[in-house]
Amino acid sequence: ELVEALQKEHEVILAMPFVGHEEDFRKMGIECIPVSMNRRGVNPFAEAKLLRDYKRLLQKISPDFVLTYSIKPNIYMGLLCSCKKIPYYANVQGLGTAFQKPVLAGFVTVLYRIAFRKVKYVFFENKENAREFGERNIVSADRQVVLPGAGINLEKYKMEPYPNHSRVHFLYLGRIMKENGIEELFYAV
């Protein structure tokens, strides 16, 4: 829905590691540029290559503005857009494991502070993350926007009554991580 809304007034180009849906975006008339990225990787050579790839991408496209999602694009594109004076916006979906290890959290905090110096707005999917970024002096409250929700469009996907069976079959698709609520899920099951 975000992409469709942006398309009404802008040319939209998506640059990301595509793991499905690339063809759906192409059918919408969107240019898709695959980007190779290891989400959890910390190899300095691979990270330098990703930064160089992003730099080339900005030179090739010359965007009017950039919207980033997830930690690496937020930080790397934030740094590059700041240097090139390209307006940019960032979306923080969650803090992830980077903020659970004190040394890594300190390093990532410094990177975010530098990357978000000139960010227009940072969108958060929950208020706790926005508060954490404020407490760490990463981004001021006047540039924070907490989204009212992210996920399933309940207008399009209406809630259905449970099947009339004695057992409910439940399928969980997601990462088994404490910070994502896996303990609460196991307790509920």
Feature names for model-found ranges:
Residues 20-21, 72-73, 128-130:
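Alpha-helix capping/helix-boundary segments
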Residues 40, 71, 152, 175-179:
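Nucleotide-sugar-dependent glycosyltransferase donor-binding/catalytic pocket residues
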Residues 161-180, 186-189:
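Conserved donor-binding/catalytic core segment of Leloir-type glycosyltransferases
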Residues 45-52, 87-89, 96-118:
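Nucleotide-sugar donor phosphate/pyrophosphate-binding loop at the beta->alpha transition
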Residues 1-46, 144-146:
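N-terminal strand-loop element at the rim of the active site
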Residues 31-34, 113-159, 169-172:
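Donor nucleotide-sugar binding/catalytic pocket of nucleotide-sugar-dependent glycosyltransferases
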Residues 68-74, 92:
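Short His-centered aromatic/hydrophobic patch
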